[in-house]
Design a protein with these regions (language model features):
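Thiotemplate assembly-line natural product biosynthesis machinery
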Residues: 2-25, 81-82
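Phosphopantetheine carrier-protein modules
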Residues: 19-39, 55-67
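Two-component histidine kinase catalytic core, primarily the HATPase_c
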Residues: 44
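C-terminal structural segments of small proteins and small subunits
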Residues: 66, 72-81
Length: 83
C-alpha cells in the first residue's frame, strides 16, 4: 500500500527536526526553497537525506539533490520512490 503524502510530509519534517530541532515546521512554506527557510549547512543537509533514506527506504543519488530544493519537491520525490 502506498504511503500517503501527509504521512510523507510528516516523515520529512521529523527527519528535518532530528537535525534542526529549532525549526518551526508550522512556518515552513512548502513551495519556497527549504534552505532559504532553514539554516542547514551541507553536512546537515546530508544528514536529512540520510534520515529520509532510513525512514522511507529510498536511495537518493547525488545527481538528484538539486531536485530536492523545496519541501513539496522532497515529498513528491519520496512519493515516487517509497515502497
Amino acid at each position: 500500500m502506498p504511503i500517503n503524502r501527509s504521512d510523507i510530509r510528516r516523515g520529512v519534517l521529523e527527519s528535518l527536526l532530528a537535525i534542526a530541532p529549532e525549526v518551526d515546521t508550522q512556518a515552513l512554506d512548502d513551495a519556497r526553497l527549504l534552505r532559504d527557510q532553514v539554516d542547514l549547512d551541507s553536512m546537515d543537509w546530508l544528514n536529512v537525506l540520510l534520515g529520509l533514506h532510513r525512514r522511507f527506504g529510498i536511495d537518493i543519488p547525488e545527481t538528484d539533490y538539486a531536485r530536492l530544493a523545496t519541501l513539496q519537491q522532497i515529498v513528491d520525490y519520496v512519493a515516487e520512490r517509497a515502497r
